[in-house]
């Protein structure tokens, strides 16, 4: 099984790549700049998970394609079973052309997971791709993600690795009604029937927590 992640930020590396790798996927990260170069050199990202008392540190193997290499980036998306985006909701429009090219060349239905901390991220992607692919977009699945893990840091280590530091929770709620077969089986990912309710519950808990501190 193959997964492609557009973006090489904290959530892309510290959650999406880690969870997909643990579930048996060969992960390709599509990034740019110094982070992409370091990942390509080391062929892995160093993940550190800590709850303040215990710390776990391990390497997650990844392939890396620089977004400047359009042909390779499109090929990575076209050959993936699962595609993730983790670029920030405001940046999504900038990756829609690339995503459309890859999905157009995909031989089978692909599930796209938007790790964007935005209630309508999947809707934004689907709408943008419909303008580019027409009815062809309907054979693919598009879901947002309600993420429990906070990934606070992304740094370069002395030996040249990219290290991301987050907390241990691994649960990710996804929209089960928006997926297509074969549904991706990812450890910690929970398909639900009312995705919007879960997103708003997270938003309420986050806002309420900050309002009382």
Predicted regions and their residues:
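Substrate/ligand-engaging "lid" and interaction regions
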Residues: 1-4, 10-11, 16-213
